[in-house]
Design a protein with these regions (language model features):
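Active-site-adjacent pocket-lining segments in enzyme domains
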Residues: 2-6, 12, 27-35, 53-55, ...
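Short gly/ser/thr-rich secondary-structure transition/capping motifs
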Residues: 46-54
Length: 183
């Protein structure tokens, strides 16, 4: 079974990372958290320590179905500054693989990969200038082919549900949403 990987860097937005992992695991998706540093403990933007499942060096891109980047500052900047991660995302994207980013991550991570068309995206307000090639939308979550973007923390669950729907079905995503009392 292919896996989804959610990447963590110091300063990640806790709600966007852990909320998405929770939604996907409720939908029985195998999702692994991945530290981009040489240690598994990563500290969120609000001081919450998290122990990642894997280190970036442990990830085989060929096993990936979805590569997911949460936002948060300076977490999203740290993800975008990680050359090995950006190269992995580029390779995955070039093969038609799914990528997802929320908050500042579309601007600070996805802006670093070469895309073959003008994608419709959203991001945290004020970061749009980093995505001059994208068609920006004010929506909370935007799905455009194999790219899913989210606006920020308030949309973390909807972002996770959009990923879940791509991986499974609308029915599974609706069942998970109902179980979480989401409208």
């Amino acid at each position: 079974m292919r896996k989804s990987f959610l990447f963590l860097a110091d300063g990640f937005e806790e709600v966007e990372a852990l909320g998405v992992v929770d939604v996907l695991r409720r939908g029985t998706i195998e999702v692994k958290t991945v530290s981009i540093s040489d240690k598994k403990e990563v500290t969120g933007a609000h001081g919450v320590p998290v122990v990642a499942d894997l280190l970036l060096s442990d990830v085989e891109e060929e096993e990936a179905e979805f590569l997911i980047c949460p936002g948060g500052m300076p977490g999203a900047k740290n993800l975008g500054d990680c050359t090995a991660l950006v190269q992995m995302i580029q390779k995955h994207f070039d093969k038609g693989g799914y990528v997802a980013a929320i908050c500042a991550a579309p601007a600070l991570v996805l802006s670093k990969i070469k895309m073959n068309k003008r994608y419709t995206m959203t991001c945290y307000p004020g970061f749009e200038e980093y995505l001059p090639e994208a068609e920006m939308q004010p929506h909370g979550v935007v799905v455009d082919g194999n790219v899913i973007t989210g606006k920020g923390p308030a949309y973390a669950f909807k972002f996770g549900l959009a990923i879940l729907e791509q991986l499974t079905s609308k029915k599974v995503a609706e069942e998970v949403a109902a179980g979480m009392l989401l409208d």
